[in-house]
């Protein structure tokens, strides 16, 4: 039991509403420290989590020359300097290479290595996240979160000070409650140091998604659960806790904490309101979880064995030494609400108009007579002009629709095959009939930005924001600026992904 003084100190930190700039004086980790459970890992690409922190939040690497830059808060305790990233990455692509630990323990997160499962990058590593996939504002100031696509993950297998064995710990994360899937496993927290499944109870991490292979909550999900290894748990039962609700706030606070034969799940709208407790009780009723056998590595976006099929968005999170009180966590939630997370535009460059017919012209020298078209389900570039046949003009024309998965972006419906849309499948663009599934909608949603070569637009995949419409050998792909596929070649990338959009031929 925390002394009343500690609880009051934690509350005063968060609720005193003494402000500098846009954020209250105390950060989440100041509040945890006041409550007697200090942060041993503190990760955020959006803001400082200590009032005095002015060091780097994250590192980006740009595609044009491989140079890196650290992005720090605008001021101590403040919001990230997104303008510094925008300037550094102007006219090229950028990836998030390091998410720095603000606790001083050096528990930085970097590209996850292979483990029980291999990632899609060379040598089995996971992908790195786009630096622009998750723009937000905090108190009106722009920042970027970490948009985790399937195959993307970060890890630290040599963390310092994190809980091991049955030692107590707490953790929270601010996530996008609308970005998830049912694959394993979008986690943040404590995992195995070997990147392999070493048995029941060897993890304690926040999970978010609608996976139903192990435990579930009420409704159809998504749920906040705990990945304790060899199971996603919503409570003491390995199967179901009806008290763990489906929850999908755009900004979501997720909390998991555990100590000897006790653990809890809590959650809230990160933009307003207070935390609710969805489970508080004994460890799971099956063997291997009492006592726990935590190993102390840190993961983001993946499972403990590097299962990397999940997706989600991470804005900030911490891990603590000791089991935080509800009062401390309530004060942290008040701080998160005071940060005023809000959405920001996913698009830039020349505007598109929903309902209009467009054609997309290549800008690569030597290919400027070619437009995005289709031959059946194959999407390619073809030479099109005002004197082309009506059939070809229709094949090279697309109706702009509101994004099927995100209304801030767009989907492109065929003019000559109504009901069929451009979508990527295995990163090859194809024309397919809308089957109404969540997966189709996500694969068929694209976000235009100012063209990387200074002309027109580059068309970015919403669910894989490192990937863009690219023509390669006159076939269309969702390509990244460097990668394992031949169509990811860096040569001519900026030209190949830039398109001049005009009124449709048909």
UniProtKB/Swiss-Prot annotation:
Free-text comment on this protein's domains from its UniProt entry: Organized into two domains: an N-terminal catalytic domain and a C-terminal arabinose-binding domain (ABD).
Transmembrane recorded as keyword: no
UniProt-listed Enzyme Commission number(s): 3.2.1.55
PANTHER family the record matches: ALPHA-L-ARABINOFURANOSIDASE B
Family, similarity comment: Belongs to the glycosyl hydrolase 54 family.
Identification of the protein by name: Probable alpha-L-arabinofuranosidase B
UniProt binding sites for substrate: 227, 230, 304, 424, 426-427, 443, 471, 476, 496
Taxonomy, superkingdom: Eukaryota
Pathway as given in its UniProt record: Glycan metabolism; L-arabinan degradation
Physiological role: Alpha-L-arabinofuranosidase involved in the degradation of arabinoxylan, a major component of plant hemicellulose. Able to hydrolyze 1,5-, 1,3- and 1,2-alpha-linkages not only in L-arabinofuranosyl oligosaccharides, but also in polysaccharides containing terminal non-reducing L-arabinofuranoses in side chains, like L-arabinan, arabinogalactan and arabinoxylan.
Gene: abfB
GO molecular function term, any single one: alpha-L-arabinofuranosidase activity
A GO term from the CC aspect: extracellular region
Positions of the UniProt region annotated as ABD: 344-506
Class of this enzyme: hydrolase
Organism this protein belongs to: Aspergillus fumigatus (strain ATCC MYA-4609 / CBS 101355 / FGSC A1100 / Af293) (Neosartorya fumigata)
Catalytic reaction(s) noted: Hydrolysis of terminal non-reducing alpha-L-arabinofuranoside residues in alpha-L-arabinosides
Record Pfam families: AbfB (PF05270), ArabFuran-catal (PF09206)
Signal peptide span: 1-26
UniProt keyword list: Carbohydrate metabolism, Disulfide bond, Glycoprotein, Glycosidase, Hydrolase, Polysaccharide degradation, Secreted, Signal, Xylan degradation
Ranges for region Catalytic: 27-343
């Amino acid at each position: 039991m925390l002394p009343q003084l500690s609880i009051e100190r934690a509350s005063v930190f968060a609720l005193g509403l003494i402000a500098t700039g846009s954020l209250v004086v105390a950060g989440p980790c100041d509040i945890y420290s006041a409550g007697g459970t200090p942060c041993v890992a503190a990760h955020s690409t959006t803001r400082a989590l200590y009032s005095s922190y002015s060091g780097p939040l994250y590192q980006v690497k740009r595609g044009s020359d491989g140079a890196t830059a650290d992005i720090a808060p605008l001021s101590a305790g403040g919001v990230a300097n997104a303008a510094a990233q925008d300037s550094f990455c102007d006219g090229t692509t950028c990836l998030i290479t390091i998410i720095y630990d603000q606790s001083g323990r050096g528990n930085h997160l970097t590209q996850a290595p292979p483990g029980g499962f291999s990632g899609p990058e060379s040598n089995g590593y996971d992908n790195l996240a786009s630096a622009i996939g998750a723009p937000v504002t905090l108190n009106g100031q722009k920042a970027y979160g970490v948009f985790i696509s399937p195959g993307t993950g970060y890890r630290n297998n040599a963390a310092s000070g994190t809980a091991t064995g049955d030692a107590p710990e707490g953790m929270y994360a601010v996530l996008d409650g609308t970005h998830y899937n049912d694959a394993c496993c979008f986690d943040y927290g404590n995992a195995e140091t070997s990147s392999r499944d070493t048995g029941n109870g060897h993890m304690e991490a926040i999970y978010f998604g609608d996976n139903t292979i192990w435990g579930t909550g009420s409704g159809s999900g998504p749920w906040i659960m705990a990945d304790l290894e060899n199971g996603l748990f919503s409570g003491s039962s390995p199967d179901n806790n009806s008290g763990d609700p489906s929850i999908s706030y755009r900004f979501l606070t997720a909390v998991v904490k555990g100590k000897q034969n006790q653990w809890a799940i809590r959650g809230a709208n990160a933009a307003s309101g207070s935390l609710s407790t969805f489970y508080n009780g004994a460890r799971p009723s099956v063997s291997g979880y009492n006592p726990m056998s935590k190993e102390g590595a840190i993961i983001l976006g993946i499972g403990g064995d590097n299962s990397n099929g999940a997706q989600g968005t991470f804005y900030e999170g911490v891990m603590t030494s000791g089991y935080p009180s509800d009062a401390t966590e309530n004060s942290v939630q008040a701080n998160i609400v005071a940060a005023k997370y809000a959405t920001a535009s996913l698009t830039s460059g020349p505007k598109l108009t929903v309902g209009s017919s467009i054609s997309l012209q290549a800008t690569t020298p030597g290919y400027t007579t070619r437009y995005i078209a289709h031959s059946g389900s194959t999407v390619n570039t073809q030479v099109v002009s005002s004197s082309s046949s009506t059939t070809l003009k229709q094949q090279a024309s697309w109706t702009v629709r509101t994004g099927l998965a995100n209304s801030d972006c767009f989907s492109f419906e065929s003019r000559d095959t109504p009901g069929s849309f451009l979508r990527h499948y295995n990163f090859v663009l194809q024309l397919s009939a809308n089957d109404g599934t969540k997966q189709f909608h996500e694969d068929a949603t694209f976000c235009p930005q100012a063209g990387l070569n200074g002309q027109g637009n580059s068309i970015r995949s919403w669910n894989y924001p490192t990937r863009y419409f690219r023509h390669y050998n006159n076939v269309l792909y969702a390509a990244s600026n460097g990668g394992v596929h031949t169509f990811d070649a860096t040569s001519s990338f900026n030209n190949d992904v830039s398109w001049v959009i005009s009124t449709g031929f048909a």
